[in-house]
């Protein structure tokens, strides 16, 4: 490709509304342009990267035995009503009616569509297992699209769905997809972790996220410093402390705390160690409970894990925090004065709270706290559960080492769905015993557009993007200095351009009438891994300057050796 025949829409300045580095560089490198909130046009440079990501995904899906299909973006509402997700999915599901007043949705995912297809196409266990995938545009009406294509409303996704007659068969496919995902992200040159995860709104039994490690990530990735244990923050278990509860050394006293409505204020004003404080959160109780609310207690320096809390049998799903009005009507005190002593609703405490002694908590009286509270002396020990987020330094749940926490960008997610959708949509086949058998399902997603942004978040410097070779828009940049004035530079540039292309190498030759500084800046900005610079001074010695984008190292290569050198560098 020649720049004179190409749309190289680079920008010198960073757009003001671009928050994260990937969004900034994708705009500056001429990869994308914003059409509307959360909607982007992919320009040629960006599309080349996107297609390379897509091709790697497709190759590994094929290698794993998945079968490619293509399903409609527009889906009839009755399928979503049949599955129960019409009400559950919320405002991210874009709903509309056609001219006949028939309701439809723009598909954010395709569990319903593929299950409907399978229930009409398959009849016998002999046809299974099967695993179908597509790479297709999805739409989710995000309330606040942000970070460019990282959290856009329209995006390209690879979604796959497998069907089985046994858990053992599902596990085999799940393991194969786990391995395929690991190959995909390894081929792309990404630093990633596969972590255990909660199944969330998709539902099901088991789940893993694939997280690209990056400071700009929205997720906390938890892993051991001494083993392969890895999980996301929602799933990671906070191990119960091994040390027994210390004996009480203080009497419980009622203290006036009129200006301490938060743990931070309590600690500061009364010089308390935060590890000796407890915070109390009230949430809605499950429907049918004899109490409207449930009290959840975590140590003052810990955070409630809402996913874990929602799974408690006493707690309503989705987890809903009580309003101040609801709290005052029941407890007769505000949210800043709550504690376990004389709490009129069921209490669940975190494992760490269970081993605390001589601690401080609200007295359920406005402007007052109890200091020196001890379990079983001042208040009975309530139900104990793991309801907090882990913190760095916690022991690893597998007993090996301690936990580290890094930020991550979720680029893939695999689920063992079980029979959630097949039961709802009555997808079954005749089993080996001749009886009707509900199918067991798995689903496997990769955010193809998100992978592009995640790769940039991991691969950039002060000059621009530093693409991993496998997904770079071009493999080689040819920069002929003053080619429009030097016949030999122009002649050699054309010769090398043709020879490299004949070797199957993707080349961008900058044949613009631009200053060398502009040419260098643009090629470094868009991140082409290998650059050769042709100039009269070096050609006097039969040399060509080669530069590797990742480390910036330069070397002189003889003109007769440059093609073989590049072929070896790229193809090995």
UniProtKB/Swiss-Prot annotation:
It is found in: Cytoplasm. SUPFAM superfamilies: Class II aaRS ABD-related, Class II aaRS and biotin synthetases, YbaK/ProRS associated domain. It catalyses: tRNA(Pro) + L-proline + ATP = L-prolyl-tRNA(Pro) + AMP + diphosphate. One of its GO terms (cellular component) is cytosol. GO terms for biological process: prolyl-tRNA aminoacylation. GO terms for molecular function: aminoacyl-tRNA deacylase activity; ATP binding; proline-tRNA ligase activity. Keywords: Aminoacyl-tRNA synthetase, ATP-binding, Cytoplasm, Ligase, Nucleotide-binding, Protein biosynthesis. Pfam families: HGTP_anticodon (PF03129), tRNA-synt_2b (PF00587), tRNA_edit (PF04073). It is an enzyme of class 6 (ligase). Its main location: cytoplasm. Belongs to the class-II aminoacyl-tRNA synthetase family. ProS type 1 subfamily. PANTHER family: MITOCHONDRIAL RIBOSOME PROTEIN L39/PROLYL-TRNA LIGASE FAMILY MEMBER, PROLINE--TRNA LIGASE. Catalyzes the attachment of proline to tRNA(Pro) in a two-step reaction: proline is first activated by ATP to form Pro-AMP and then transferred to the acceptor end of tRNA(Pro). As ProRS can inadvertently accommodate and process non-cognate amino acids such as alanine and cysteine, to avoid such errors it has two additional distinct editing activities against alanine. One activity is designated as 'pretransfer' editing and involves the tRNA(Pro)-independent hydrolysis of activated Ala-AMP. Homodimer. This is Proline--tRNA ligase. It comes from Citrobacter koseri (strain ATCC BAA-895 / CDC 4225-83 / SGSC4696). The gene is proS.
């Amino acid at each position: 490709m020649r720049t004179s025949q190409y749309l190289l829409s680079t920008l010198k300045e960073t757009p003001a509304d671009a928050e994260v580095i990937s969004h900034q560089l994708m705009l500056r490198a001429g990869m994308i342009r914003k059409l509307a909130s959360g909607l982007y046009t992919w320009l040629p440079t960006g599309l080349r990267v996107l297609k390379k990501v897509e091709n790697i995904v497709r190759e590994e899906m094929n290698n794993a035995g998945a079968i490619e299909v293509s399903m409609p973006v527009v889906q009839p509402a009755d399928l979503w009503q049949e599955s129960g997700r019409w009400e559950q999915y919320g405002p991210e599901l874009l709903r509309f009616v056609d001219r006949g007043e028939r309701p439809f949705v723009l598909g954010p995912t395709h569990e319903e569509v593929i299950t409907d297809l399978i229930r009409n196409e398959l009849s016998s266990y002999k046809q299974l297992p099967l695993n179908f995938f597509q790479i297709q545009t999805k739409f989710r009406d995000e309330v606040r699209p942000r970070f460019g294509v990282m959290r856009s409303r329209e995006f390209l996704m690879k979604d796959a769905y497998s069907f089985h007659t046994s858990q053992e068969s599902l596990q085999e496919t799940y393991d194969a997809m786990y391995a395929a995902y690991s190959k995909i992200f390894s081929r792309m040159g990404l630093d990633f972790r596969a972590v255990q995860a909660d199944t969330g709104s998709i539902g099901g039994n088991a789940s893993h996220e694939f997280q690209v490690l990056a400071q700009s990530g929205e997720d906390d990735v938890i892993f051991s410093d001494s083993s392969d244990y890895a999980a996301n923050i929602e799933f990671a278990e906070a191990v119960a402390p091994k040390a027994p509860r210390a004996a009480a050394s203080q009497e419980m006293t009622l203290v006036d705390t009129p200006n301490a409505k938060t743990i931070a204020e309590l600690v500061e004003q009364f010089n308390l160690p935060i590890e000796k404080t407890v915070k109390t959160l009230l949430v809605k109780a499950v429907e049918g409970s004899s109490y409207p609310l449930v009290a959840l207690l975590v140590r003052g320096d810990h955070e409630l894990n809402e996913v874990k809390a929602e799974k408690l049998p006493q707690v309503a799903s989705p987890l809903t925090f009580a309003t101040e009005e609801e709290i005052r009507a029941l407890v007769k005190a505000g949210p800043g004065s709550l504690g376990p002593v004389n709490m009129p609703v069921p209490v669940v405490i975190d494992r760490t709270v269970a081993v605390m002694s001589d601690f401080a908590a609200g007295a359920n009286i406005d402007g007052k706290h109890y200091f020196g509270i001890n379990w079983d002396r001042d208040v009975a020990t309530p139900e104990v559960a793991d309801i907090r987020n882990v913190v760095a330094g916690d022991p690893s749940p597998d007993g090996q080492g301690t936990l580290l926490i890094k930020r991550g960008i979720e680029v893939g997610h695999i689920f063992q769905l079980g029979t959630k959708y097949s039961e709802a949509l009555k997808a079954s086949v005749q089993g080996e015993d001749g009886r009707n058998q509900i199918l067991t399902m798995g689903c496997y997603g990769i955010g193809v557009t998100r992978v592009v942004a995640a790769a940039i978040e991991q691969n950039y410097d002060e000059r621009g993007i530093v693409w991993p070779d496998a997904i770079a828009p071009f493999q080689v940049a040819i920069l002929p200095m003053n080619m429009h004035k030097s016949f030999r530079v122009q002649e050699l540039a054309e010769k090398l351009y043709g020879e490299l292309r004949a070797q199957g190498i993707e080349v961008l030759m900058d044949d613009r009438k631009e200053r060398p500084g502009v040419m260098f800046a643009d090629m470094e900005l868009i991140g082409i891994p290998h650059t050769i610079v042709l100039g009269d001074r070096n050609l006097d010695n039969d040399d060509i300057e080669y530069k590797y984008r990742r480390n910036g190292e330069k070397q002189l290569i003889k003109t007769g050796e440059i093609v073989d050198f590049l072929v070896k560098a790229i193809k090995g």
